[in-house]
């Protein structure tokens, strides 16, 4: 048997002050969490529509994989999403994540605007002409006469238990005004 002398334990290699040689230890759990996060990002990409997907900066291979996953059902889709996650590990996902966040934020802003418009419409129908000056302050290009006519018709429809045609038209009119700004 070849025995090493016991003094080999006392030998300490010289320290090199190079930061480039530093090894960063990453736990297996952290690697799994990162892989799962990338797989979730891939799932979000697969769930996007074609128009939204065009706004995300994806290379050809990744875009083809996402489009294929959108066509596949059940178990094959799960495997394809895992492949997309694997492909994302080899890429810089920061621009992709940023573009996704912008899309989500735009959607949240639109939902918030719709809630505000619905509240304004409800106030118009309930309180009538008293709220019209508020609407004109928010949207100066609004037509007072058209708005009053829609509000009166909506109130009549509500009193007669008719379908809320004018109620919907008020919302559409308010949405058009909001989009013009």
Curated annotation (Swiss-Prot):
An example Gene Ontology molecular-function term: ribosome binding
One Gene Ontology biological process: assembly of large subunit precursor of preribosome
Any one GO CC term of the record: cytosol
Upper taxonomic lineage: Bacteria, Pseudomonadati, Pseudomonadota, Gammaproteobacteria, Enterobacterales
Cell compartments where the protein resides: Cytoplasm
Function (record text): Member of a network of 50S ribosomal subunit biogenesis factors which assembles along the 30S-50S interface, preventing incorrect 23S rRNA structures from forming. Promotes peptidyl transferase center (PTC) maturation.
Protein name, UniProt field: Dual-action ribosomal maturation protein DarP
Source organism: Yersinia enterocolitica serotype O:8 / biotype 1B (strain NCTC 13174 / 8081)
NCBIfam families reported in the protein's UniProt record: PRK05255.1-1
InterPro entries: DarP, DarP_sf
Chief localisation class: cytoplasm
UniProt-listed PANTHER family: UPF0307 PROTEIN YJGA
Keywords: Cytoplasm, Ribosome biogenesis, RNA-binding, rRNA-binding
Membrane spanning stretches: none
Family: Belongs to the DarP family.
């Amino acid at each position: 048997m070849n025995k090493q002398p016991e003094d080999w334990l006392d030998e300490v290699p010289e320290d090199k002050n190079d930061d480039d040689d530093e090894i960063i230890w990453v736990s297996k759990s952290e690697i799994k969490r990162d892989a799962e996060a990338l797989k979730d990002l891939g799932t979000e990409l697969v769930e996007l529509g074609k128009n939204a997907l065009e706004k995300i900066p994806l290379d050809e291979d990744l875009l083809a994989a996402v489009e294929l996953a959108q066509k596949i059902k059940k178990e094959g889709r799960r495997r394809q999403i895992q492949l997309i996650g694997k492909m994302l590990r080899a890429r810089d996902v920061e621009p992709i994540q940023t573009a996704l966040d912008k899309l989500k934020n735009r959607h949240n802003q639109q939902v918030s605007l719709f809630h505000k418009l619905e509240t304004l419409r409800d106030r118009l129908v309930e309180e009538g002409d008293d709220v019209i000056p508020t609407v004109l302050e928010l949207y100066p290009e609004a037509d007072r006469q058209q708005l009053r006519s829609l509000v009166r018709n909506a109130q009549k429809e509500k009193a007669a238990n008719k379908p809320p045609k004018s109620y919907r038209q008020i919302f559409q009119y308010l949405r058009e005004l909001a989009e013009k700004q």
